[in-house]
Amino acid sequence: MNYLLWISYKGTRYAGFQVQPNAPTVCAVLQDAMQAVFGCRPDVKGCSRTDAGVHARRFALSFCYTGKVPMQKIVPALNAHLPPDIRALEILPVAENFHARYAAHAKTYRYYILNARVDDPFTYDTCHRVGAALNLAAMQAAAAQFIGTHDFSALCASGSSAAAHGDTVRTITNCTVVQNGDLFTISVTADGYLYNMVRILAGTLVDAGLGKRTPESIPALLESGDRRRAGPTLPAKGLFLEKVDYPGLDDV
């Protein structure tokens, strides 16, 4: 039986989702829990390769399991063996050929920025602090310029395999910035992402909020394909994978 499992995790202690040698990862810890519950280590297919320090509110993964543990007991059983910074949320059966990464037609990320002079001791590891005042209207106007189908080479870190193969065109369907007190939230929904794309996009929006660039400069930035003309890559700690959309499963 092929299953789709939704999990949530705080990525602070982990070197990303994918299993890596000599480094703690979310997938490795999850497979340890599966070993304890199932007596085996299923091949886990994640929806994304989140980097070290990145968090996820609803991360999707698929795996095959044909053992005796009934589906309705899997989530509580896994949680009994998982650390508190990783939680299993929901599970459902899916088609045998379902792959959590390739079946996704959109993912939503959010980047959280604390606009304050000092860090908040309760959120310092889940948001990035900017001390100087940010102009919300400028950030919103700049965000709107990213919506659409573009070559996002300028928002791609070096070393990207997609960039090496010229596969840098993506479609952003939503890009917004909202403010709630000192907290700025950047939300991006797209059909796919390049390496560090959201963190570079967020850094570019911060530049706009600080008056270092105008919203009207964004189209020329994208047209240039030059990473050096975009903003800085903001720290991983402010980035969350919020949602993964699958055809026919969007209400799950």
Where are these regions (language model features)?
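Structured-RNA-binding interfaces characteristic of tRNA pseudouridine synthases
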Residues: 1-252
